[in-house]
């Protein structure tokens, strides 16, 4: 393919796409430049479908290269290791809008790789990668019902900004990413500072206008350099077999579905499956996989039919009904804060831990070095769904759910000045039947309040679903697992009473329009307020006192010029304070100092030691010091941490002293008076001028 270059203007910057320049052996490849950010995106597909699977094997990789920001990787090996959390979240951003646009039943392996080659701080590389993935797939022979476009949206001073720069992102009230086709929205992800539903909807639709321009641009590229799509050969089920299975199994599946409890429902469906397979195994011994597929289709149709025609869900709820909720706080006696949040058969335990500011997480990737003072981790063990599988650390889904819950609470976390602690939340999914990420949001709010963290407002979350059959649109509140699995949308919305703090929307159909979005956001608002009311019945506000097991923080402000003295040569002074008191000390460049102690007594002792260092030594003042070492000409005495002076042998006593050891020894606590401080800061001390005459006489 000959090299071709295509350009368009997008939100005040040039978007440049080069085709045929690099990676020509891939099915599709695009070199995309926006500002000074450059991303290479490739798409490859296997020639044959993978046998024996019932899912689409799509993998998306987002490769961060540190040379893109002029850095050399740390560590001994000096090369990039496993993907960062940011890279995993970016890969999910690319994956989610393109996945529903492949043909249903397509089983060829498809791999999309986005390699970040150069990063402009004002241009988010994940947005460039999302556009590049659409280009690479659209020009290739891989079946793909695109193209899609993607933009970021900020809100600064009441104005929407497309693809905001670094400074604008810092000021923005929302961080929104939207992807869509020419006709509809496909994916939404957002973090926001209590933004009203109307504003969020306006932002999404504003983004769609720019997405249309990107799609039109990519369609032009496809016309010029695109190749014909390969034929998709889908497995067809024998019509006679399908009719027989439907006639035999439809009513049985319908009855099995009408069960409120997930486990009982699954057991009933398993029994029907076994009964059907047993019934047809002699007539169709080689078509058992086809029978399973027909049963799946019947189950999906019947579940959706209940909703669209009967307006009732498999567990008996109406479309807007929320499952029963119960909450409990303070469930773990030795933790700093804990809560269990249960909604139906979804149950999450969230634990809050408070630490010193030195416990912050430092993120050093292709962006600016970032310090995270608040973090949320999400664990999804196999027992939560009654399964057995190896425990191998968090997967992409767990990292994504943890990040969503973290984003939902971030706007209400108090500032470092208000609450000088590092905060870690861990959500343990104890039982799962849909919407565990939003249960984690609710559990996190309760755990923070139980820990005494002065959050600005409580946050709750709810997952919305969609069943769309022709013109009949049914939006579901608080979806359970089967409705997520067999439905058309998973739309998670978290927020406070005032507005939205986080959104994540994924769909399985080609797209949804403004009216569906508007309906879903309004129903989510009502659901969120109901859930908040249930949570506040358990704990109305953050506790006034921290847990007795939580660390105590003492704040000080010192003269920045004194920081060097507090630290001491090679960190000797501060290390001594920490060793003697058992505290943690964090010092900011502007003189803010935080002492984190397990108890107030040790914290106060460390504070006194620091005050002694920062207090200026004055001539004529008397101090209680400790003898550090002895020389033939005198004794060196520490009068404050890191500050010592010399008591000359002639200043030890009013009487003549033959040997220093005759008067003092190492480790003695003695009173001394400052007699002089020279230009170099050396301190001269006198013992004989500090003691009353009678005490001197008594000693001698």
UniProtKB/Swiss-Prot annotation:
One of its GO terms (biological process) is RNA processing. Involved in mRNA degradation. Catalyzes the phosphorolysis of single-stranded polyribonucleotides processively in the 3'- to 5'-direction. The keyword 4Fe-4S does not apply. HAMAP family: PNPase. The keyword Protease does not apply. InterPro entries: ExoRNase_PH_dom1, ExoRNase_PH_dom2, ExoRNase_PH_dom2_sf, KH_dom, KH_dom_type_1, KH_dom_type_1_sf, NA-bd_OB-fold, PNPase. It holds the Pfam family S1. The gene is pnp. Its EC number is 2.7.7.8. One of its GO terms (cellular component) is cytosol. It is found in: Cytoplasm. The lineage of its organism: Bacteria, Bacillati, Bacillota, Clostridia, Thermoanaerobacterales. This is Polyribonucleotide nucleotidyltransferase. It catalyses: RNA(n+1) + phosphate = RNA(n) + a ribonucleoside 5'-diphosphate. Residues 551-610 form the KH domain.
